[in-house]
UniProtKB/Swiss-Prot annotation:
Biological-process GO terms, alphabetical: translation
CC annotations in GO: ribonucleoprotein complex; ribosome
Keyword Repeat among UniProt keywords: no
Protein name: Large ribosomal subunit protein uL4
Description of how the protein assembles with itself and partners: Part of the 50S ribosomal subunit.
Gene of this entry: rplD
Function noted in UniProt: One of the primary rRNA binding proteins, this protein initially binds near the 5'-end of the 23S rRNA. It is important during the early stages of 50S assembly. It makes multiple contacts with different domains of the 23S rRNA in the assembled 50S subunit and ribosome. Forms part of the polypeptide exit tunnel.
Organism this protein belongs to: Ehrlichia ruminantium (strain Gardel)
Lineage of the species this protein comes from: Bacteria, Pseudomonadati, Pseudomonadota, Alphaproteobacteria, Rickettsiales
NCBIfam families on file: rplD_bact
Region Disordered, residue ranges: 56-78
Length: 205
């Protein structure tokens, strides 16, 4: 499957073959859901915590004698039924991460890239290196396409490109080693460099 390769001036400078095993995979919303949930679970801090009866400060003395008071027996003022007492079965500090099969993760990436390609929201760029800082040039480039947000994925990017995109809220730069399903779906248009296409073919095939 041949698609056009463009430069930073939005000019067609050639063509590239996209492997249909990566860029023309059947749409699988169930796989996308699994991979996105896996990614977001790994990002969770898991710092939620409530105090158990061993964490609550206060006396450990029995509040009153066991019998002959006419009241229910109590062993501690730190028990959950008292104001300021412990929380039973509350959240604890933990990791929410879990493992997901590598084949499923790779399939999710293929489905996400194929989805963008089928919607004409996938562009191939020759290079993302610019030798100067000029936000206006990047702005002119993205204005040629009627998309809301852009994810630019490349092998690496220099300071010129980084600072040129820094002030654009709808443009995100990402190194190819960090290509992931969540960021692809979160942006309207995905821009890959020629090097990134070759990298993805080696990674996913």
């Amino acid at each position: 499957m041949e698609v056009n390769v463009i430069n930073i001036e939005s000019q067609n400078i050639g063509k590239i073959d996209l492997n249909p095993l990566i860029f023309s995979v059947n749409y699988r919303p169930d796989i996308l859901k699994m991979v996105v949930e896996w990614q977001l679970s790994k990002r969770r801090v898991g710092a939620h915590k409530t105090k158990t009866i061993g964490d609550v400060s206060g006396t450990t003395a029995k509040p009153y004698r066991q019998k002959h008071t006419g009241r229910a027996r109590q062993g501690s003022l730190r028990s959950p039924q008292f104001r300021g007492g412990a929380v039973i079965f509350g959240p604890v500090v933990r990791s929410h991460a879990y493992s997901l099969n590598k084949k499923v993760r790779n399939l999710g990436l293929k489905v996400a890239l194929s989805l963008k390609n089928s919607c004409n929201k996938l562009l191939i760029l020759d290079s993302i290196d610019v030798n100067f800082v000029k936000t206006a040039q990047v702005l002119r480039f993205i204005k040629n396409f009627e998309h809301q947000s852009f994810l630019i994925i490349g092998k690496d990017y220099n300071k010129g490109m980084m600072y040129s995109c820094k002030n654009l809220h709808n443009v995100t730069l990402l190194k190819q080693i960090g290509t992931n399903v969540f960021d692809i779906l979160r942006h309207d248009c995905v821009i890959l460099t020629v090097d990134t296409v070759k990298y993805l073919e080696d990674r996913l095939l």
